[in-house]
Amino acid sequence: DECVEATYRLMQSDFMGPVNIGSEEMIAINDFAQMAIDISGKDLSIYNIDGQDFLDKYGHKCPIGVNGRNSDNKLYQEKIGWSVSQPLLEGMKKTYEWILEQVEKENK
């Protein structure tokens, strides 16, 4: 719901440039995936491949990336005057519940 509010506020503003909207909490992709698994209550495992296995599967070396991702919302805060207030985990839980509701409606 905060993403919707942020988008609505942006649309109501006079600002015309690109902005980031998201959690400012730094999180690794594996941790984000594990968070989604934990919220869902499903019995899933994360499997990463690297080294020779990655090379064999994709034909090039495994890319080296950053340790985590987060959103820098400073420009949004400056131009729109609003910022995210709920933790990433809470937003993910609400999103998962909303998705479940949509799936249940579709399956009726």
Give the predicted meaning of each segment:
Residues 1-108:
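C-terminal substrate-binding subdomain of Rossmann-fold SDR/epimerase-dehydratase oxidoreductases
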